[in-house]
Curated annotation (Swiss-Prot):
Keywords: ATP-binding, Cell cycle, Cell projection, Cytoplasm, Kinase, Magnesium, Metal-binding, Nucleotide metabolism, Nucleotide-binding, Nucleus, Phosphoprotein, Transferase
Family: Belongs to the NDK family.
Gene: nme2
Protein's recorded name: Nucleoside diphosphate kinase B
Primary residence: cytoplasm
Residues engaged in binding ATP: K6, F37, T68, R79, N89
C-alpha cells in the first residue's frame, strides 16, 4: 500500500508523529516476526487508529477478553460476543505479566499513569 503524509501533515511537522505510531506496532509484535502472518499483522494493526489501555485485575482480564480464537471463547467475553475470526478478534491482551510490562512500557510513558490505592482490594483478594 502506498502511504503519503499529505502537505498539511508535513507542514505541521507531523511526519515523526506518524512514524511513531507505525514503529511501536512492529516492535510490539517483534516476537512473531518469523511467522508467515507477521507482515499482514503489521499491515492490519497499522491500518487505522488503535485505542491503547492498561487494565489490571487478578485473573480477570483474560476472562473478560476471551480466548485468542473467538470460536473457543465463552459467551459474555468480548471475543465470545463480538468476534468470529481469529485474524480479526478486535482486542489484544498481554499473554504474560512479563509481556504486559514490556508492552505497557512500549506504549506508555510512566508519567501517563495515575498512582492510587484501591481500598477494596484488601477485601477482595487474599
Amino acid at each position: 500500500t502506498f502511504v503519503a503524509i499529505k502537505p498539511d501533515g508535513v507542514q505541521r511537522g507531523l511526519c515523526g508523529e506518524v512514524m511513531k505510531f507505525i514503529q511501536p506496532m512492529k516492535q510490539h509484535y517483534l516476537d512473531l516476526k518469523d511467522m508467515p502472518f507477521y507482515a499482514g499483522l503489521c499491515k492490519y494493526m497499522s491500518s487505522g487508529p488503535v485505542f491503547a489501555m492498561v487494565w489490571e485485575g487478578e485473573g480477570i482480564v483474560k476472562m473478560m477478553l476471551g480466548e485468542t480464537n473467538p470460536a473457543d471463547s465463552k459467551p459474555g467475553s468480548i471475543r465470545g460476543d463480538f468476534c468470529i475470526n481469529i485474524g480479526r478478534n478486535i482486542i489484544h491482551g498481554s499473554d504474560t505479566v512479563e509481556n504486559a510490562k514490556m508492552e505497557v512500557a512500549l506504549w506508555f510513558k510512566p508519567e501517563e499513569f495515575v498512582t492510587y490505592t484501591e481500598k477494596a482490594k484488601a477485601w477482595v483478594y487474599e
